[in-house]
């Protein structure tokens, strides 16, 4: 890559070696992705003065001021990895100017390689796409262009998307679904015999205070200050977009209270999230389409597809990470010691189960890393199926296409997790993705759901059968 940017072969080798040694040194003192899932261990408060005293070779204040962030806005900091900063501080003091120059050059190269010549872009894809992920070819030009518009002006595109694909009737249906799932999760909380009344009461308080976002934000981003100039290069316009986003972030957040109406995904994103620090659940319009949601389908389909997604995000508020935050999003313990012990014992069983799954002949899953997502998948299934029973109790659904309502619920769930994935990508995801692979979000979750056995008549000797006393349950 350095040579493609005009550097000599000798300089390219020298820079590459320096960068590799530097980043390897930092990798050895970085927490693993599993360790980063512990909110308490990664919540280390210190003042700006303490930070500067602890790490004198990291000019944090000067860097922040250079970005337009005043020192008065950063007098209190949360340092996720003190050991990393300690090592980086020592490394910065020891590095010579040529290494620091190489690092800065590489930062520019990596951040610009997708926006310059085809030769540079293809070299970037050869490594990150082919070598790291096993992809055979890059996205076509139309998709790369569309993705770029989405990345830089996501809400402008989202506003058009919602007008065309997300009617008000769909939003109202989702509001009803969310309400029914909240009722169901409350019932599941009450049903846990291992949990004390005092902790259940706190759980209900948190559940009742969920801030729900559906479809699109209440206020749209104003892009009037963003100037896209056709006379300038593609990369120059990308930089203009980045500067606009950076300036906007600082202007709206530095020294300001948290904006609970801010969205962390664009409306057209096919995803959903739970944010523990604001106790909010968000379902963008992009995921409120088939095969997750169909306004013309019956409850069996919608509760099995988007219903489980809703239950999944709600359960995140009570998984191994989310349970450590209270109803207002503060990192605060609201569990009795016995209840916390009971939770951890059950959660450990999930971690062990998914760690024993062979995703490839020579590779097991990482149940500890994927614990929160696996708990949310199982909880989402339990909560959504219970909600389906509630809403159809007085008016049972009929069989359709030869399948019972219960069967169609589970088929709808399984249908959203089909994947066409390379072996290289599997290996990457096991290391880097906190979700289990799509196959195991189905085959690893359903064998622990009693209703699934009843729906399909699964019996001893069948491939996915697990004895009842070995099935896991938390929510």
Language-model regions, residue ranges each:
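Zinc-dependent metallohydrolase catalytic domains
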Residues: 175-307, 316-475
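Noncatalytic, helix-rich "gating/capping" subdomain that lines the substrate-entry/channel surface
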Residues: 1-180
